[in-house]
Amino acid sequence: HLAKICYEQAGITDPVEQLSLVELHDCFTITEIVLYEDLMLSKRGEGWKDALSGKFSKDGKLPVNIDGGLKAFGHPIGASGIRMIYESWLQFHGKAGERQLADPKLGLAHNLGGYPWENVSAVAIVGKELG
């Protein structure tokens, strides 16, 4: 389970409490809901409920795709992952304009791609460099 490994490596035990933002590959609405659950941000079968509750809105418990995600911001195939990392960078450096979160510490960027017979997925925990 990719998310579990990534969280363990980053020292994250409760992603909803410890992450400040998430950028995920929402190429289709159902993909976003499934990823809430796969990334352990929602319990199995409850991603849709969490989405409707506002849990993942800008002012919710864990803001997800506050730049609009792939469906609203755009899906530059081959560069979507870079765009997600860039949005995280903007947030961590206070340069996200109207989308700016108060004081983000850690974020998660998720991307996927490929074909039905060959697929790849990547998860990165990112944050503002300290020191």
Where are these regions (language model features)?
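Claisen-condensing/thiolase-fold acyl-transfer catalytic domains that form or cleave C-C bonds
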Residues: 1-131
